[in-house]
Amino acid sequence: MLIIWEKKDIFQSTKQIFKLEYEKHMHNYVISVKNSYKRREHITQEFSKHHILFDFFDAITLETIERACNELSISLENSQLSDGEKACFLSHLCLWKKCIDKKLDYIAVFEDDVYLGKDANSFFMDHNWLTNNQFDFIKTETFLQERKLAFSSIDLPNNRKIRELKEPHLGTAGYIISQKAAISLLNYVKSFPEEKLLPIDHMMFEQYLYYKSSSPIYQMIPAIVAQEFILYPNQNNMPSSIEESRLLRKQNKQKRPLLDKIAGELSNLFRKTLGKLLRTRVTFY
């Protein structure tokens, strides 16, 4: 494959780097703050290495939160989310709306600190494998944790499988949704009272997971997307811009009643002992 490198702007999307017709391929969007030059350089190099076309989606920022809320007809004024969490939340919702408005069959969404696994272009350059299996919602990312998955699996190319996710697996750095799933997710999130809204990964991969009208969420095994802080915890070249908000949320979390705390500890004990037999470690490859 011929690669054309534009020296004047290494951060442009790879649809200008590769001589291919983008419309015939998966629509890949990387959420990134416009002036995050280091992260954008990393993504350009990572996706170019795998010969994958993508577009940067300029992330919502503190300055554009109000405008994004108006465009989405949603209010976050009384939510408990920090400004950073609001911006992240809205960035994902804007992409779902883009998928719906442009009538795209599928979109793949990434955050800008990810690494891609082996043969990634087999999954992010063509969506026939999704259409053929009628998948609507796939988590391509992992936190390298053990998760409860459906026993049955569906084989994918290059020694990967798909299994339905049966318990929360947080993170929004890598997922694929169909237009049908985008509509379902957007309607679900917008139906929530704003004071009950949680960070977007909790809404998608925890709350929505148990929603009776949700599209099934499938986990790719091994996962093909992982963030830098997961794969290289000591490297920290791209620190999270909302990690402070998450830590503050944990510190300010309301203390649970004693009985709830005991029940939680027993649940954790089961998960770490007998529960391990029911779970699968979601590896990265």
PLM region descriptions:
Residues K8-F11, M203:
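Intrinsically disordered, low-complexity regions of eukaryotic proteins
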